């Protein structure tokens, strides 16, 4: 069934007439030319990304130039699985982020928000643990509380010869993985499409079915398929996030970013904020993307709802996110699908 599904998707993209009419603001879809512009922007701003070419001229698509058939980034770290351990950790490290929060401790005006899980370890108080000691005869002592000051610093110990290392077992059982991420253009859906190829800690290819351990359950069960990457001559199975909802989610994210920008500018005009508080350039883009409610946008797309935003006319100078910045927002969306994969690693400025 998966093979048939993959074949149908490939044929759709191969034979669908390509549209060159821009409907970026209206639909969240982009043209091949806009995909190239967004790819050039991504590669320029984030050099861990690069353009790739098909293995042979026969595998190239005519609507994209040679050498710019897809985007790729390699060695993206992934340190933990999306299993019960991941969920439990997230449950202990969650916070409500209000719309308008600046992520520096200042709350926004909106009471609604989205739940941010994980990544808050530094904000949690350290808990004192009870430990037991064992003497030279093997007798177990009573429980006692150990304070931080009493814990020896391993850096102060020089007894390296006493450490038993098993590098083979470590690499086999390690939770650490790396991923190569590919972004191609889908003419049928007129959106980017993400492919993932994983590797174990020892460098061995990750079995395709194991890649689903790093994908959020809702997507893993519904919209993720294992398919061959169409630009490679050898059949290499990868996990791919199906783009059927990409356009509607992206449209909602773009609309919300524009609405937030308009609100900020209205406050500036009203004198409620100084011009120095309005970030610009790459800093401003990262700030806008960091506040996007991906979860809410996904829910709206699942219900086939279009975000209702004020119908004010907006020119290119007033939009929060330009079309050439499309892939930066797209990767924010994909990071919510694969939260264990450190997408931020690929986007260091």
Curated annotation (Swiss-Prot):
The active site is at 244 (glycyl thioester intermediate). Keywords: Autophagy, Cytoplasm, Protein transport, Transport, Ubl conjugation pathway. Residues 95-173 are annotated as: Flexible region. Transmembrane segments: none annotated. One of its GO terms (molecular function) is Atg8-family ligase activity. A motif (ATG8 interaction motif (AIM)) lies at residues 306-309. One of its GO terms (cellular component) is phagophore assembly site. Monomer. Interacts with ATG8 through an intermediate thioester bond between Cys-244 and the C-terminal Gly of ATG8. Interacts with the C-terminal region of the E1-like ATG7 enzyme. Also interacts with the ATG12-ATG5 conjugate. E2 conjugating enzyme required for the cytoplasm to vacuole transport (Cvt) and autophagy. Required for selective autophagic degradation of the nucleus (nucleophagy) as well as for mitophagy which contributes to regulate mitochondrial quantity and quality by eliminating the mitochondria to a basal level to fulfill cellular energy requirements and preventing excess ROS production. Responsible for the E2-like covalent binding of phosphatidylethanolamine to the C-terminal Gly of ATG8. This is Autophagy-related protein 3. It comes from Gibberella zeae (strain ATCC MYA-4620 / CBS 123657 / FGSC 9075 / NRRL 31084 / PH-1). The lineage of its organism: Eukaryota, Fungi, Dikarya, Ascomycota, Pezizomycotina. The gene is ATG3.
């Amino acid at each position: 069934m998966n093979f048939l599904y993959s074949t149908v998707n490939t044929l759709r993209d191969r034979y669908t007439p390509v549209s060159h009419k821009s409907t970026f603001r209206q639909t969240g879809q982009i043209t091949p030319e806009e995909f190239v512009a967004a790819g050039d922007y991504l590669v320029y701003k984030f050099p861990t990304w690069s353009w790739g070419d098909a293995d042979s001229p026969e595998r190239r698509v005519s609507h994209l130039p040679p050498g710019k058939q897809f985007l790729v980034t390699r060695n993206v770290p992934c340190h933990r699985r999306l299993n019960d351990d991941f969920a439990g950790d997230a449950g202990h490290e969650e916070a409500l982020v209000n719309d308008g929060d600046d992520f520096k401790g200042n709350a926004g005006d909106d009471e609604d928000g989205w739940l941010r899980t994980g990544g808050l370890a530094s904000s949690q108080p350290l808990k004192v643990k009870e430990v037991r000691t064992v003497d030279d005869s093997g007798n177990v002592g009573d429980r006692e509380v150990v304070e931080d000051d009493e814990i020896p610093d391993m850096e102060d110990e020089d007894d390296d010869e006493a450490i038993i290392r098993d590098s083979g077992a470590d690499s086999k059982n390690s939770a650490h993985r790396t991923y190569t991420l590919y972004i191609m253009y889908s003419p049928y859906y007129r959106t980017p499409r993400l492919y993932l190829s994983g590797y174990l800690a020892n460098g061995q290819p990750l079995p395709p079915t194991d890649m689903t351990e790093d994908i959020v359950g809702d997507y893993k069960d519904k919209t993720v398929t294992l398919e061959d990457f169409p630009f490679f001559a050898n059949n290499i199975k990868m996990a791919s996030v199906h783009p059927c909802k990409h356009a509607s989610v992206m449209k909602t994210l773009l609309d919300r970013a524009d609405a937030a920008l308009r609100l900020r500018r209205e406050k500036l005009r009203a004198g409620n904020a100084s011009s120095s508080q309005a970030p610009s350039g790459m800093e401003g883009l990262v700030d806008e993307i960091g506040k996007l409610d991906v979860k809410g946008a996904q829910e709206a797309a699942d219900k086939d709802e279009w975000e209702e935003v004020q119908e004010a006319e907006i020119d290119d100078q007033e939009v929060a996110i330009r079309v050439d910045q499309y892939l930066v927002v797209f990767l924010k969306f994909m990071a919510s699908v694969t939260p264990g994969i450190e997408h931020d690693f690929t986007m260091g400025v």
